[in-house]
Amino acid sequence: MDTTLRDGEQTSGVSFAAHEKLSIAQALLDLGVNRLEIASARVSDGEFEAVKRVASWAERTGNIQKLEVLGFVDGDVSLNWIEAAGCRVVNLLCKGSYKHVTEQLRKTPEQHFADIRSVINQAIERGIAVNIYLEDWSNGIKNSPEYVFQAVDSLRDLPIRRFMLPDTLGILNPGNTYEYCKEMVTRYPDLKFDFHAHNDYDLAVANVYSAVRAGIKGLHTTLNGLGERAGNAPLSSVLAVLKDQLGVDTTLREERINYASRLVETFSGVHIPPNKPIIGEHVFTQCAGVHADGDSKNNLYCNDLLPERFGRVREYALGKTSGKANIRKNLEALGIDIDENSMRKVTERIIELGDKKEMVTTEDLPYIISDVLHHDTMADQRIRILNYSLSLAQGLKPVAALKIEINGEAYQESASGDGQYDAFVRALRKIYTDLGRPFPMLTNYSVSIPPGGRTDAFVQTIISWNYAGVDFKTRGLDADQTEAAIKATLKMLNKIEQ
């Protein structure tokens, strides 16, 4: 079960709009997730409308039983909310530790169990299926196991689909996760259990591994590991561990995980760390030249986590640790062949740039080669920016006027935009549209400057593009941010002409 849309949305600063929830739900089901927890009942009017929208789509497509909503032991209040939203499964939040019952609810276990039974009976009468969370189960099984067993024993005769065991405060480790889960599975072999990990000690994935080894059949995850505090077990890591480390067959389509993860990154505003396993930007990038050389010799530096499994490709970084093998791999991708002497000079220049902490992309290579081999960089360009003017005035939209040359022909256009660079790109698009030429889609835009906060520091702008289904990046470096972006854009224009 994926809970990105419920627990994941409890990440500080994250809130999904209705259309975003629907898009994420569709991506998760396309990925092969079996169940989705899409909301908590009673949260807000906006959440209610979002759940209605997702449920309406799920009803039309035959997926309504895959949607679940967190509900509370509150009589019929949560059930009314869930039913009105169009959902058919409640995940009832019950207390899984004696301390929570007596100190938070200020009730006896018997009173709490009676309240739970009442809600479950109402749900069944309405045709709403029931799973139950034993909230704070990890503390409960550790400090008051007799209460946990009493709770399960008093409720097991009811038509509960799954008993869900959350490590609510993320206190478990792989050793006691196995011990406690094994105890539940052994004691109640006829019941279905889920394990819900939290990542407070950075052990969520390891604990999932132990839970499965102990016999747990249901797992809770989130895309990108979003969730309360340190988050939940990330779906990307869990799917790889299940297949490679445990040999477990699932319905998950690995090649879809990167798309779903990037979608959530965009909607949540929470960036994926570049070194995050499976989905991080750098995890399929070889930096050391010896690794690239080994990859050319029967994949000596590859493990089972091949990037193609996850809809990605292996890359070879260019920097001070690069060797000729790294550079050759990137030149092959560009269809460029140079002799050994030229290769040595290019390698030296890339190492020099790396020492200065400058980022070198594949698309920079033709420029570096031209520079190193004393060619006229502009001579090989099919697209030139002849001149341009950018204006910014208080109370008025920025305006850009530009003149470019394409294959020897000059074209001129102007446009306004929400910023100077936006105006520049809009003017470019006008020219390309008039010529019937496709224009790449800008997918990401990042700016960085060296530490120190100097106003005259060089700005590095890295722009990600998608053209004809192919993703690539271009880089511009200048003391002016807009100039840096324009340089990156010019590289893009010539890149697509190759």
Give names to the regions the model predicted:
Residues D2-T4, G247-S414, R454-F458:
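A mid-to-C-terminal "edge-of-domain" accessory segment
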Residues Q10-T11, S15, E20-I24, L29, ...:
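Non-catalytic terminal/interface segments that mediate subunit docking, oligomerization
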Residues V101, D167, T221-E228, A240-L252, ...:
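Short beta-alpha connecting loops at secondary-structure transitions
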Residues L5, S40-A41, F72-D74, C94-S97, ...:
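Short, ordered loop/turn segments at secondary-structure junctions
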Residues D7, T11-L36, W57, T61-G62, ...:
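Alpha/beta enzyme core
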Residues L169-L172, E179-S296, Y301:
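Catalytic alpha/beta core domains of metabolic enzymes, predominantly
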Residues V470-Q498:
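Mixed-charge, glycine-accented linear interaction segment located at domain edges/termini
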